[in-house]
Amino acid sequence: MTISELEETLKEEARLFLSRARGLRGPHTEDLFARRVYIGPEDVHVENYPRRPLAVFNPGAVLEGEVVHLFPRLVFEYYSYASAIGHATLPLKDLLAGRIPKPLPVRILLYPTELFEAVRGCEDARAHRREGGYALFYTGVGKLGDARNTDSKEVFTAILSLAEFDEAFQLKRKAPIRIGLSGEETGLALYLPTKNATFLEGDHVLLRPSLPGLPD
């Protein structure tokens, strides 16, 4: 199956689902988790950047023994709304009891350095413990594909990306995820415009791609 055939197959599956699932959503919500604590920008201290964040939200999390690793999204100014991803740790028992240190120490792990992150940065980590370290799915928002044809910051591509860290949280590599042959110039690589992905057992990955002409 070629890349274009794969994309058309995914579109057709999505269209079939939409034809069956359309309707009005009922006015009902059900909390699946107990709220323990809120962590806002006033509650954190970023150790490796001089400015205080204006927003701290959408954290990824990894439970390792009795320690919770948090990977929050950090926004330091609203003009460009560029994001970085930080790292903090909390004892599980303290988190369950609603106790956090004030301020909570946070270190920036990921920030925009590549063209595919050059507009709005690194967003919304989904973190996983992997052999030899940690893996973070995130959304890189920058210049990729047709977005490279203009300098306008209003034109960008949001792309599923993956960063790998060693045991000491030193970055080993990061890149956008694509299916197919390496090298965009071949026309045989399908980049995945999606904000949701997670590892399943082994090396299997669960994706929710965004497809042209279909609602997210």
What are the roles of these predicted feature ranges?
Residues 1-54, 62-120, 128-216:
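Beta-rich carbohydrate-recognition and catalytic domains
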Residues 58:
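Extracellular/lumenal glycan-associated surfaces
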